[in-house]
Amino acid sequence: RLLWRTLIGHSWPAEGIRRLLAIPRSIHELIWGLLLLQVIGLQPVIAVIAIAIPYGALVARVVSDLLDSLNERNLQALVAAGTAPPAALLSAMGPPLLPGLISYGGYRLECALRSATLLGVFGLGGLGNELLLTLQSLQFHELWSGLWLLLAVMLSLEAVVGALRRRWGMPGRFSLRAAGVGRRGRELVLAGLLLLPLVFGVGRALAIEPAALLHWQALPPIAPGGWQEALALPWPSLVFNTVLLTLLAAALAVGVAPLLLLLVAPWPWGQRLLQLIWAIGRLWPPPLTALLLLFVLKPGVITAALALGFHNLGILGRLLLEGSEAAGAQRQEALRCSGTGPRLALLYGRFSGLARSYLAYGAYRADVILRETVVVGLVAGTGLGTQLNQSLSAFAFDQLLLLLVAYAALTLLGEDLSDRARQRLLQQ
């Protein structure tokens, strides 16, 4: 909204684009991969496009929300002084936007790593294909070797992103000399230029051919009477169970992260242990966690909610830790020096200032959990995800189309509710 209001004086194009991008956002990358598989065939480019479509829409929404949450006074001052709107936007909003953009970009890159593993079965190869083969052959020792390798890659990625965030997003507290003007900008441009040949080289090594997107295959015809069968599905029950699964998983993920940090506050090693557990939660995709839970639990909404909640708990826990580190320890140390216990000092010294932004991000995370109900549909035994998997297996494209429309409608409704909740939290 801020971008369009500054450039043309109206924000209505932002609302239209936001609603339009809700359609690709509402469909999980796994479903995009299966749909593209029917249209294009088995090609490595399928996995790349299947990840890029929903992730591009998600990044657009998050960047828009970050821009709208920033203070506009510097921008208004530059525009009032006669600066061109594009230059004013870049100068006033670029520096405060950079830390959040780096943090979210690293998180989204980590998500893409997991999605590439999940979509490796579409011809991309790599760990995804190897993990699928080990599961099919019941070679679980090889499965764990692959997962530990993926964990090492993910932790290395976190370390690199953390170093970049500290270098580009935070001031140097002990630096005796101020950084040169435009240093961060020059380093960002240089990093982008260095990444371009790397991206092309990796794409060439994986035999990714964009020309394959031009050769489409015809979808099978819809059987007579298919629409009547699709409309006869138990839609109220499917929607209710999907919403219930989303709410349970979101409550588990949002509520447990700060409670665990408060619980281990007196012990320095406790936070390290939590970081390891949360890293495993981010590493394991929800379907794998759900399969492990089936050894001790029955298929149902609770099992699927635990799988989704554990995965998203790892994500929210990491972001809460990053926010705590960025907030500084001055208030917490002042409370400790006055005799306050470690848990209360952490609660009032750090978490109180992060509560609104954390809950606002939790509202956004609930939208993502709604998308992820697709991948645990078989474990839930009910809901739109289960029915969508059954329709895909039966090639019932009439049912599939209606189910995707239902997911898009739920996503639009969820985004509207989460936007209202987030704006109310951030404005208080």
Q: Language-model segments: what does each one mean?
A:
Residues 1-2, 30, 100, 104-108, ...:
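Hydrophobic positions within alpha-helical transmembrane segments of bacterial inner-membrane proteins
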Residues 1-12, 157-269, 273-275, 419, ...:
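N-terminal, non-cleaved signal-anchor transmembrane helix
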Residues 15-25, 65-80, 91, 103, ...:
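Short amphipathic alpha-helical coupling elements at transmembrane boundaries
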Residues 17-55, 275-309:
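Generic hydrophobic transmembrane alpha-helix motif, especially the helices
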Residues 20, 24-30, 34, 60, ...:
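Loop-to-transmembrane-helix entry motif
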Residues 34, 38, 47, 104, ...:
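Transmembrane alpha-helix boundary and packing residues in multipass membrane permease domains
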Residues 42-108, 115, 159, 299-350, ...:
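Membrane-cytosol interface at the C-terminal ends of specific transmembrane alpha-helices
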Residues 127-164, 384-420:
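Hydrophobic alpha-helical transmembrane segments of polytopic membrane proteins
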